[in-house]
Amino acid sequence: GLRDLVGYSVKERVPLVQGHKGYKIFTNPPPSTGGTMILNALSSLSKEGAVGPKEIEKALMLAQPFGEARSSSVGSTTHLSIIDKNKNVASITTTNGVGAGRLIGNTGVMPNNMLGEEHLNPHGFHAWPKKQRIPSNIAPTLVFKNKEPVLALGSAGSSRIVSAIICTLANLINNGSSIEEAVSSPRLHIENGVLHHEPLKGWGAVSG
C-alpha cells in the first residue's frame, strides 16, 4: 500500500569490480545475482586464450548454480547503454516483471511488480519477507581498459541475460572480436540441464 511506497528508499551500492586479461569489468553487486554469475564465469576463463563453445559451456555451468533460483522467465525488460562526448558512460537495465496493472496518471508509465514473478517469489505476493529486496539476474555492465571506457552492455531476455553477457565478453576479451562481432556471434545458454546453442556459420538446418 501507500505506506510501503513511502517507506521505500533507493540504495546506492558499490559495484563489483574484477580484472580480466587487461580489462576492468564493473557490474552490479548483491542482492542481484547477475553480476556475481558473470564474474564467476569470467574467472573460470581467466587462464584461457581464445575460447570456443566448449570453454564457454564450462564457464556457464560453473556460473549457473548462483542463479538457478533467481532466473526471471518473463519479458518486459529493457536495456540502455549510453556514452557522451566526455566519455561519461552508463549501463541501465529496467524491468517490469509482471507489471503492477496500473498506470501513473497520464504518463503511460506502469510501475513494476516483481513479487508477482513466480520464479522469484513462488509462494505468492504476501509470502515475501517485509523490508527485504527481491533479487534479480539483470546485470548492467561496464568494461574499461587503461581507464578508458570500452563497452557498456546489458541485456533483456530474462533467464538468458547472464549467458548473453558472458558470451559477449568472452568473444570480445578472450577472442579479440570487434564489439559488433562479439554481440552478434552465436551464443550458448544452459537452462534446466539443457544446452541451447545458436547455429554457427555454415551450419545447415537440422530436422527432427
Predicted ranges, named:
Residues P31-A69, G75-G208:
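Proteins synthesized as precursors that undergo proteolytic processing into mature forms
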Residues G1-P31:
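Accessory "access/gating" subregions that flank catalytic or transport cores
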